[in-house]
Amino acid sequence: SEKYLQSRDVKYVYFNYELDGVQCKDDFGRTNAPADLYKKMLAGAECRTSQVSIGEYMAFWRPFLEEGKDVLHVSLSSGVSGTYESACQAKVEIEQEFPDRKIEVIDSLQASSGYGLLVDGLADKRDEGLSFDEAVTWAKEARHRVYGWFFSTDLTFFVRGGRISKTAGLLGGMLNICPVMDVEADGSLAVKEKARGKKKAIARVVEVMSQTAEQGNAYARKVFISNSECASDAQAVKELIKEKLPQIDDINIFTIGATIGVHTGPGTVATFWWGEEPRA
């Protein structure tokens, strides 16, 4: 969330999306509150995301570079967006203007609050006094240990986006099937399993977490949960995590923004944690 990023002193650039041909900023719901956005989508509004442009990246970084600062930029996963490529091209261009400054672009290989969890960890390292180069090395290794598993109770937009076939979507709706998905090692999204009902989907996500988390059931680091207009489901995930992994006391629930939400629609809950091993 915007408040969380500000509390960690993390600077950010807005993503873009189109709603019925109108260009909008993904500005934490100020332009379109999530509930309104999903209502419009369900009513048939045309929605699509567009990546941050090279010019937008350069305009975002330039003030910091002019102040004599170096820039370490973490991008949304290249597995779900072309924005990493834009950032890399912007880096090449702006380096010509600021040859004495360091500019590094890192592919988070994550989305939503998984992307956020990596940036949060990086902010911790910055506050611990890591040098620029040490922070880059840390982030490139750490990104492989952020796990993200999620499920959805509404398959409409997964079908629309081609992630699930129409037949599977129809059957899934009739049989109350929730696809359980993850963020793969290459940063793309994949359907891993299918659960009958959200209770089983929630249980499976928490089970995977206990199997893969740093120190297993003794995991005591942060957990980030994102949801698209299904706060009670996110709360149910949080409660089960607290029951199964009692050492955790820092579980944050966030709202899925438009950049991811236009692909998932309402009814999606995503859970992110630090893993013991890199994602396979």
What are these regions (language model features)?
Residues 1-56:
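N-terminal glycine-rich anion-binding loop in soluble enzyme alpha/beta folds
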Residues 1-21, 72, 79-83, 87-92, ...:
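Mixed-charge interfacial surface used for oligomerization/domain docking
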Residues 31-38, 61, 65-66, 93:
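A short glycine/small-residue-enriched secondary-structure motif
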Residues 42-78, 85, 89, 136:
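Glycine-rich phosphate- or other oxyanion-binding loops that anchor nucleotides, phosphorylated ligands
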